[in-house]
Amino acid sequence: DTESRVDFTNGFTESYGDPLGMKASWESIVNFKDIAATERTKKLSANAQWFEDNSPVDGRFKKEKVKGISAKVITAAILGGDLYPSTAIGINLPNSNWVRKEYGSKSVTIGNITDAYNKAAHGNGFLNEYVIDKSTLDNINKYGDACDELHTDLHECLGHGSGKLLPGVDPDSLKAY
């Protein structure tokens, strides 16, 4: 389902915490779609083939036909299990490579969590200490949050949705690395 305004995930979903990648941890999220921000991710998804074709990657690792990338930005209303109290800023399902290859992927950016992390980082002194000059600092303060949101969208929509493994390569060969 890619059209619902309210959605949820509830169950044993992610296997990152298991070194063998076999047991998943339980997580739950109830959310609603951020319509305006979702338009931004839809533009990226609609152009996924262009990004794939023009990426600076050996052609053996490029998908000939990118398909089924759906993307949205959500506002998390409730988090539980492995998603609480600290959650990721994005979700990409399914985890199975063969399902992704056959049907595509569902990319989600959790907008209110990204916004909260960005706000928490403001005023902590890091930028004042390490940014080279006032002009650069002004640009970071003006555009930094928007750039961070776009970076997350690019990662979720195109990073997880791009590329392919060579024939015979086990998708779990790197385990938790």
Regions found by a protein language model. Name each.
Residues 52-55, 161, 165:
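A generic secondary-structure signal for well-formed alpha-helical elements
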Residues 150-164:
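Active-site recognition of the HExxH zinc-binding catalytic motif
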Residues 163-177:
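Post-HEXXH active-site segment of zinc metalloproteases
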